[in-house]
Amino acid sequence: MVTRLSGEDGFVNDDIRVRYTRFSRGGVGLLVLEAMAVHSAKSGPLLRISSDDFVPGLSDLRARCHDAGPGKVIPQIIHFLKISRSGWRQTVDLLSLDDLDAIVDAYGAAAARARACGFDGVELHMAHAYTLSSFLSALNRRKDDYGGSLENRLRLPLRVVERVRREIGHDFTLGVRFVGDETIRNGYTTVDASLIAVRLARAGVDYISLSAGGKFEDARVIAGEPLYPYTGYSGDRCMPGSHYPDGANLYIPKEVRAALRAAGLSTPVIAAGKIGTMALAEEILQTEQGDLIGMARALLADPDLPKKWRAGKEEQVVRCVYGNVCKSLDENFRRVDCTLWPKKLGQAPESTDEIAPRWAENGPNLRAGTKSGAVVLQWDRATDNEGIYGYQVFRGEQGGVLVHRASVRGVSTRYEDARVLGGEKYRYAVRPYDLAGNRGAMSESIVVDVR
């Protein structure tokens, strides 16, 4: 996930250093820095690795991240096709053979810089709406050796892998992130994705990270604005929101991993896409749906999630609600923060060992009523030394387990749930949390019969 914290020049700055060292302190095993351009292109406030001028800043960022936490640190490198506010966008058929040679050279040089910076590896961005993904796409209809058949569509990405490996050697980690299901009309599915993964693994890729969608073909068109590839259905599938089930894209790593193993390849597969609970993450690993767990939004909400999971403090995790405010900020070219952070902080608060929030002696006095077909909850305020930041609301349906429904921020002690059906019974509970992410005790639950 990009941060849009870099300046227009693409250099590392203090905001970038603060953001990524915060992730490192949280205990991630592998920190993949946001996509940085391998070429000199106007890409807004995004990092670049397109010349040696960027090496000092990236080297410093790498060193700070290594000092801050135990995890490995690698950059994700990317090539963008051109787009304009008129709605025009460059497509793969407009690129000459010389252009393709230049793309291969740019990736090779950028990967060499990544090694010179002291990173632990490099990840090639071949996903979503960007150059290498557009060559892999089933919609790549070039009439030469770089389009049409799957073999031809793989030609440029495999040239990039070969060149990068030559530049970095075989003792430096090389990963690839690509789309396992384009989720667009006439796009490829996990069938092609499995074949792509096998070819990449045989070409010497050390791990494969899988995503979905994020394409220009179904993006919403707004007059006078450049296309943003995460506004259509494929964009929803790339970053599944609250209306999608947890692990909505897990069929992708499961099928691709199975194809790799059937081909006799042990290449690790990263599963990603709305994986926000330890139970789901453990299930993925134990049932061999993936070998590693990839997270973006969940870590943005709480960078200390890995540390809290290891310490058995999952109840203290500030859980992402998958409202995709972060995606909307990116779409509007604004710095990407999390709506769950304290206002004006600009960063996730540091976790502490302070005493958790407490209910008053007589408890939260949770009560409920109905209004215009909605359930209205109210409760008494909790107290905390650091100040209450908000409340988590949990709901269970038809006697089922309580699951996190929403977060109510600030001094409000009221929540209205309009997504209920008449004639059904729902069970609710609330829990306070403070500025440091500490969670108080959950209230006793109440049952509401919606009439």
Set out the residue ranges of the language-model regions.
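Recognizes extended acidic, P/S/T-rich segments that occur
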Residues: 390-423, 435-436, 441-442
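Conserved beta-strand positions that form and line the central face of beta-propeller blades
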Residues: 145, 365-367, 378, 392, ...
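Residue-level signal for secondary-structure boundary sites
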Residues: 6, 83, 184, 385-387, ...
